[in-house]
Each structure stands twice: as structure tokens, then as C-alpha cells.
């Protein structure tokens, strides 16, 4: 998969929801006009000022999933463009966590940025519509093995939906589904020996079976988009594969919405392919923090402000 390997032993990874903060990228934007220019392109596609929302909006506004998703996509693409402008080395591979997979596909030239912005806004709206507010939930299960978590979910469902949805690292798995079933499963995980079962402050139970109706509608929108061949291999969440055909990439994005994010396996796959370090292209450092827990020989660093950018270049 990796062409000129001596040059590129690093991969870029792109974060998903939960990494957004009001005021993100302000420092980088102060020194690089390309950041606000990127957000202006996104704003034109959306019909509202996304940069103003990100810089001056409320946490509540930014955390609405149909606004979070375009904001994070624009942030990651802006950082990637600044990296390119500064002559940064090109990565061997890309991967993104959930929404971050869209950022990776834009940076790999698969989907046009303005179309991707509208697409992830729609993805957020469809996700929110699929589950009435207050009826879905997610919990992070800390310190329990995957098999025990899956068993706790199966035994707690009682005709409702609850399943593991993010395999973030060994000992850190997120479950999602109907609120009551998630509460039962969280309690069952604790009874089985989990250190913690932490309710997450989200309104949408992502990547579980409740998202299937949203995925069916997303598929219709994806059919209308032009997909180009990727310039870098992009490891997808749902199959831990690098697809090149439009049809296969579309299918993976549709299935991603109601299937687990296999992040642990994505990082292991990149390491097996010879990647030795990860750069996290986006706000925050969630993925950087997970890296060593997955493959302890990998190094990782975030790139999102002038200091981290110059350190990585």
C-alpha cells in the first residue's frame, strides 16, 4: 500500500465528535489566513457563518451534531491545507474516527470540500432525526474486555437496542442504544468488573442499529456525489480496509453509521503496514491519547496550533 516508504512513515488521523471546543484554531488562524479562508468556503456551502459559530457561539450551539460535524470537518481540512502550504511531508496513509473519516476522504481528494460540508451537515440532521431527543444514550466503558462488554449488551437489550459502537482502545469501549438498555448494560458492565461506566453528554446514539434509517437516507445523498480515487490510502472504520472504488467507499460510509468504529484495529492495521508515527490533524488530542494504549511502539502528536505545527513540520 505504501509507495515510497523511506520518506513517509507517518499517518494522519482525524478526530470525530467530542473534540470540538469554542475558540478552536484561533491561534492558528491568527498566523495563517488559509484557516479563515477554508471556513469561509464552508460557510458559503452552509449558508451561515461557521467561523463565527466556532469562535463566538455557545457550547450548546456548537454541540448540535449537525453543526459539530461541519465545524470539525472544516477545522481538520484547514489544518491539512496549512500543513500543505508550509511544505509538510505527505502521509503514507490516513484514517479518521467516525466523522473524521469524512475529513480523511476530503484530504485524500475523494470528495470535494464544499460537498462534504453539506453532506456531514445532512448526516448530523439525519442522525438527530432518527432518535427522538432524550431516548438514546451512550456510555464509555472503562477497564473491561470487549467480549464481556458485548455479552453485557446482549443480556441487557430486553428487546431494545444496545451494542458496542466505538472500540477506541483496549479497555475503552463506548456502548450506545436506547437509554434504558444502555443504563442496564452499563450497570451489567460494572457488575462484570468494569472500572467505570461513564454516561456521555450526547444526544444521538451513534453507530448502533437505531441509525439504520438515517443510513438509508444518507445512502441516497451519497449516490448523488462524485467520488474520486484517493491520493492516499484511507483506512475505513467499518471494515478496516483501504478502498479505492467509489462504490466501495460509499458502501463503507453508509454502513459506518450503524456499525461500530473499529479504531483499535485501524491503528493496529497502520502499524502493521509500517507506519511508525501518527499526526492528529484536528482540534484536541483524543486520538493521540489512545495511540500508545493500542500500539505502544507508535508515537503520536496533535497538530492544531502554531507551536504543534512547527514541532511537527
Question: PLM features: residue spans?
Answer:
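Alpha/beta catalytic cores of group-transfer enzymes, especially the acyltransferase/condensing modules
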Residues: 17-19, 44-48, 108-259
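FabD-like malonyl-/acyl-CoA
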Residues: 5-149, 200, 277-311
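Non-catalytic positions within long, well-ordered alpha-helices that form the structural scaffold/packing
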Residues: 84, 190, 271-274
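A short, acidic, amphipathic alpha-helical segment used as a generic capping/interface helix at domain edges
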Residues: 259-275
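Short amphipathic alpha-helix with an adjacent loop that forms part of the alpha/beta core around
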Residues: 156, 311-313
Amino acid at each position: 500500500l505504501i509507495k515510497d516508504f523511506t520518506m513517509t512513515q507517518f499517518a494522519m488521523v482525524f478526530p470525530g465528535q467530542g473534540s470540538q471546543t469554542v475558540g478552536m484554531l484561533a491561534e492558528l488562524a491568527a498566523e495563517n489566513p488559509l484557516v479563515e479562508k477554508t471556513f469561509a468556503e464552508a460557510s458559503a456551502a452552509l449558508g451561515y457563518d461557521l467561523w463565527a459559530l466556532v469562535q463566538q457561539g455557545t457550547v450548546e450551539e456548537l454541540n448540535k451534531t449537525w453543526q459539530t460535524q461541519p465545524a470539525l470537518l472544516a477545522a481538520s481540512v484547514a489544518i491539512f491545507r496549512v500543513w500543505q502550504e508550509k511544505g509538510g511531508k505527505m502521509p503514507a496513509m490516513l484514517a479518521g474516527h467516525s466523522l473524521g473519516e469524512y475529513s480523511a476522504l476530503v484530504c485524500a481528494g475523494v470528495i470535494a470540500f464544499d460537498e462534504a460540508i453539506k453532506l456531514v451537515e445532512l448526516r448530523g440532521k439525519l442522525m438527530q432525526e432518527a432518535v427522538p431527543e432524550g431516548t438514546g444514550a451512550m456510555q464509555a466503558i472503562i477497564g473491561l474486555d470487549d467480549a464481556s462488554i458485548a455479552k453485557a449488551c446482549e443480556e441487557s437489550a430486553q428487546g431494545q437496542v444496545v451494542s458496542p459502537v466505538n472500540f477506541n482502545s483496549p479497555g475503552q469501549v463506548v456502548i450506545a442504544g436506547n437509554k434504558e438498555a444502555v443504563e442496564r448494560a452499563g450497570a451489567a458492565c460494572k457488575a462484570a468488573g468494569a472500572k467505570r461506566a461513564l454516561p456521555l453528554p450526547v444526544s444521538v446514539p451513534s453507530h448502533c442499529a437505531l441509525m439504520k434509517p438515517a443510513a438509508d437516507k444518507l445512502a441516497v445523498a451519497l449516490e448523488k456525489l462524485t467520488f474520486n480515487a484517493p491520493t492516499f490510502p484511507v483506512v475505513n472504520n467499518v471494515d478496516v480496509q483501504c478502498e479505492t472504488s467509489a462504490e466501495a467507499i460509499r458502501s463503507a460510509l453508509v454502513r459506518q453509521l450503524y456499525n461500530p468504529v473499529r479504531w483499535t484495529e485501524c491503528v493496529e492495521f497502520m502499524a502493521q503496514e509500517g507506519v511508525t508515527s501518527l499526526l492528529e490533524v484536528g482540534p484536541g488530542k483524543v486520538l493521540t491519547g489512545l495511540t500508545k494504549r493500542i500500539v505502544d511502539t507508535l508515537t503520536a502528536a496533535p497538530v492544531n496550533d502554531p507551536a504543534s505545527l512547527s514541532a511537527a513540520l
